[in-house]
Every structure is written in structure tokens, then in C-alpha cells.
Design a protein with these regions (language model features):
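Right-hand nucleic-acid polymerase module
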Residues: 2-6, 93, 98, 102, ...
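Non-catalytic, well-ordered alpha-helical scaffold segments
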Residues: 30-33, 57, 61, 93, ...
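N-terminal juxtadomain amphipathic helix
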Residues: 53-71, 76-79
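Active-site-proximal segment of RNA-dependent polymerases
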Residues: 4, 9-16, 22, 107-164
């Protein structure tokens, strides 16, 4: 049977008598194939990806069978350190496990959890993300200014070693009401318990959604019990804007007490400061002018991160481990993000580095700041 024929044979609506069969969504062949293509994106040059793709049909059928029979076993994690934006231990799983993660998260977990998430919860959400979160903060600051001018305060919070402090039993307890099928719970519990307790691996796709869920009760507490109108969170980085400094001090105490039973605590970067100082969020420093305009400035460390990344790309390109097109896409994505702020000079410096590193194979794709963004506003 051809692969197309097999897809047609295995394709299903995953619905029985009006009941959605969530676990079948995970191991269904067509969904696993879609998950493979998502896991492969940007990683085709890696040997592990190539090895899996050589025997694609066999590997996908084996995964489907193992998940269906519950004989699926996670491969051993590969642990390494990353130093940007801060030092962290990342636990990366094998390519076949990444395929399972995509199928689990994209076809089941995100669908089951999204109704519980607060609107201003931006990480790992379809239709949300960093741009959405930045625009919401920008809008909040404009609205606050119209009501109170610059006379406001910000409580900026960050949780100490967030991923490493999430207790497994607490996570399972808040997950259970949203996961109706025992088979799906089996897979989730297996993944959660695959590392030491407390803590979940940063490298897993499922960990991102689970980490978003873990603080969802805190989101509702801040919005509904504390009554904070201007609030946003991206993973464990969140802010509260209010006109009363003393009330934010009380909020800080209440948030600390709310987190304590979970085994979590706010880190030393948590602070209360005047709104006129501006807010660091998602790589930008956003502040209000005296006339109520917002100004965005990208943080300088973003330049250093991209500079190191481009130099690494040059080495990978020389070894034939990455394509010229993928480098260009990555750089243009960073530049599009950077150009949202008042940082055209910084981007020009990065253009010079980019063109110097890839000048021999960059003649047809180089885009300058002027041609890419003639109409971009620096002040909003």
C-alpha cells in the first residue's frame, strides 16, 4: 500500500457516538505524520532528523503501535546548559519523542487546556506569543495614562527557578479535571514523572504548556481576587500596574502566600517601581513619555545573542549542516522583532555583521533597515 493510501486508510474523525477520542488523536497515523513535519521544521540538517526520515513509514507506524499498546518508552534525555537569556539546564529528548510531544500538545493538550487560560497569558498559546504580549502591555500603558497620567506603579515579578520547582503531584492535581481520558493521563503522568520531582524538563514541548497551566490559578487570583485590571504574564514573568503603591505591596505579600503551598517563591528580581521608569518585558524596555506616547527599546543583550547565533550559523553553513535559507529566515525574524522598537542603529550594526559573515552568498537576499522598514514608527 502506498503512503498516501495508508494515510487515507488510517484517517479518522476521532469521534465515537459524539464523544471525542483524544488518545486516538495522539497515535493516529495522519496526526503523527503532521507532528513529524512540525518536529522536523528548522532541523532537517540534524543527523537524528535524517535518520528518522530515512525509515519514516516504519518509524511512524512503530510509534503509533507503541502508543496504542502503551509500550512507548521515552529515550534518555540529553542535558546541556544554555546561557541566554540566563544560565539554565535544558533536557532535550530524542527526535522520535519530539514527534510524540507535537502530537500530544497540538492535537490534545492545547485544546483541553486553552479554555482555562486567562486572556492575558501569552506563552505557548495559539494566536498569542511575544508580539501579542508586547502589544497588550503597550495598550495597558496607554489606557492607564489616560486615567492616571504617569502617577502609577508597577509590580514586576519573576519566579525563582520556575521549571525546576514545579511539584509533580500538584501539576497532576490541577491537570486531572481537564483530561477526561485515562489513556491520555497515562501518557502525561509518564512524561511528568520522567524527571526528578520537583521539576519538569525545559526542553519538552509539553513542559511549556504544563508550566503555563501551573500558574493559571495565580492568574485568576490576581485578576479576580486582587482586582488588578492591568496584568499580563509570559510563563513566569508577569507584571501588575496600579495607581496605589501600598496596594501593590499588599499584592506582593498575597502572591508570595499564594505560591508558598506550591513550593514556589518569587526571586530577587521582583520589585515595585514607578511606571514612569518603564517596564522590561519580552526583550523590550517600554516606557511612557510626558505626553502619553509609548517608546519601545530593544534590550542590548538581544544584539549579543543574535551576534553569537550568526557566528555559529557561519560555522554550521561551512560544514554543510544548515541551509542558507534557514539562516536568512532566522535573521529576518529577529530583525522584524527588533525593528518594532526604537533601535534602527542597532539593527544597522547587525546588518553589517550579517553581510560580512555571509557576503559571498548573500547578494540576492540582503535587506537593509531602510528597505525592510521605511515606515516603522518608533514612538506610539
Amino acid at each position: 500500500m502506498s503512503m498516501q493510501g495508508l494515510w487515507s486508510y488510517q484517517r479518522t474523525s476521532y469521534i465515537r457516538r459524539g464523544i471525542i477520542m483524544y488518545y486516538e488523536r495522539i497515535y493516529g497515523f495522519d496526526n503523527l505524520h503532521k507532528a513529524f513535519k512540525l518536529a522536523r521544521r528548522g532541523k532537517r540538517w540534524k543527523p537524528a532528523t535524517a535518520r528518522f526520515e530515512v525509515n519514516l513509514l516504519e518509524n511512524l507506524l512503530r510509534l503509533s503501535r507503541e502508543l496504542q499498546d502503551k509500550t512507548y518508552e521515552l529515550s534518555e534525555y540529553h542535558t546541556f546548559k544554555v546561557y541566554e537569556p540566563k544560565e539554565r539546564d535544558v533536557m532535550s529528548n530524542s527526535f522520535r519523542d519530539k514527534v510524540v510531544q507535537h502530537s500530544l500538545c497540538d492535537n490534545v493538550l492545547e485544546i483541553l487546556l486553552r479554555k482555562n487560560f486567562l486572556y492575558d497569558n501569552y506563552a505557548s498559546r495559539v494566536g498569542k506569543g511575544t508580539d501579542f504580549g508586547l502589544n497588550r502591555l503597550d495598550g495597558f500603558m496607554h489606557k492607564f495614562y489616560r486615567q492616571h497620567g504617569l502617577e502609577g506603579w508597577v509590580l514586576k515579578c519573576d519566579i525563582r527557578k520556575y521549571f525546576y520547582s514545579i511539584p509533580h503531584e500538584y501539576l497532576k492535581r490541577i491537570l486531572e479535571p481537564y483530561v477526561p481520558e485515562e489513556d491520555v493521563r497515562w501518557l502525561l503522568w509518564y512524561i511528568i514523572d520522567s524527571t526528578a520531582d520537583p521539576g519538569i524538563p525545559i526542553g519538552n514541548q509539553s513542559s511549556q504548556l504544563l508550566a503555563v497551566l501551573c500558574l493559571s490559578p495565580l492568574d485568576h487570583f490576581i485578576k479576580e481576587k486582587l482586582g488588578i485590571k492591568y496584568y499580563g504574564r509570559y510563563m513566569d514573568d508577569f507584571y501588575l500596574i496600579h495607581e496605589d503603591k501600598e496596594y501593590l505591596k499588599q499584592c506582593l505579600k498575597d502572591i508570595g502566600m499564594f505560591l508558598a503551598p506550591m513550593g514556589m517563591q518569587l526571586n530577587q528580581k521582583t520589585q515595585i517601581f514607578p511606571l514612569k521608569n518603564g517596564i522590561d518585558f519580552l526583550g523590550f524596555h517600554i516606557y511612557l513619555t510626558e505626553t502619553g506616547k509609548t517608546v519601545w527599546k530593544i534590550r542590548r543583550r538581544s544584539k549579543g545573542n543574535m551576534s553569537r547565533k550568526l557566528k555559529k550559523f557561519r560555522k554550521l553553513l561551512d560544514r554543510g549542516l544548515i541551509t542558507r535559507e534557514s539562516i536568512h529566515q532566522s535573521y529576518q525574524s529577529w530583525k522584524g522583532h527588533a525593528l518594532r522598537g526604537n533601535c534602527h542603529h542597532l539593527v544597522r550594526e547587525m546588518d553589517e555583521l550579517y553581510n560580512s559573515l555571509f557576503k559571498e552568498d548573500n547578494k540576492d537576499v540582503s535587506i537593509t533597515v531602510e528597505s525592510a522598514d521605511r515606515g516603522e514608527s518608533q514612538v506610539r
